[in-house]
Amino acid sequence: MTIKNKVIIITGASSGIGKATALLLAEKGAKLVLAARRVEKLEKIVQTIKANSGEAIFAKTDVTKREDNKKLVELAIERYGKVDAIFLNAGIMPNSPLSALKEDEWEQMIDINIKGVLNGIAAVLPSFIAQKSGHIIATSSVAGLKAYPGGAVYGATKWAVRDLMEVLRMESAQEGTNIRTVTIYPAAINTELLETITDKETEQGMTSLYKQYGITPDRIASIVAYAIDQPEDVNVNEFTVGPTSQPW
């Protein structure tokens, strides 16, 4: 199998893991449809890809809106005739103790981290079912595997992603739709996630952790590329990825 000429949608593509994955997949010959809310950043990434003889387009997308997700898939099909894979990567991590009662941030995490993934699945599933193939990749987190103080709501949203993706894999196998799923559980990866934390004590603790252990997002990009490059009859459905030096 090869990544070359595969049509791949990436959400949360304007920075961090999404950006790193876009650049790597473009280098390997994929045709990309990049999605995020920050259009100016998407424009620069697409310019970089095209300057290196790659192929990519972009669309301003709010993953919390069903119509934005549907239009994203429609754009990919209109431009390239199909969708082979979608990387549901958009997410936020405004961690805080439950006692801080940051209810607005709780809702934002639920909307982006859970509903955003559901909206992406709903948008692409009809095409994947019709063509009896497709690859759905989602960014969860080690927080979806291991609880820690300050990460209650974030961890809950990432556990939800884990469950959604596993059930999707099981149902696809039962229904014979040949849809593969991959769930990635990153640990300390140096992205913009920490910028979403408003609780000072939590922000200081997480910043210290990431400064000590954090690795670059291209490490996750290589995992995404590896998964997409597998034969159609192989589903490598889970990856936990973190710094060698990080104890958890």
Curated annotation (Swiss-Prot):
It holds the Pfam family adh_short. Keywords: Oxidoreductase. SUPFAM superfamilies: NAD(P)-binding Rossmann-fold domains. InterPro entries: NAD(P)-bd_dom_sf, Sc_DH/Rdtase_CS, SDR_fam. Its EC number is 1.-.-.-. NADP(+) binds at residues 9-33. The active site is at 154 (proton acceptor). PROSITE patterns: ADH_SHORT (PS00061). Belongs to the short-chain dehydrogenases/reductases (SDR) family. PANTHER family: DEHYDROGENASE/REDUCTASE SDR FAMILY MEMBER 11, DEHYDROGENASE_REDUCTASE SDR FAMILY MEMBER 11. This is Uncharacterized oxidoreductase Lmo0432.
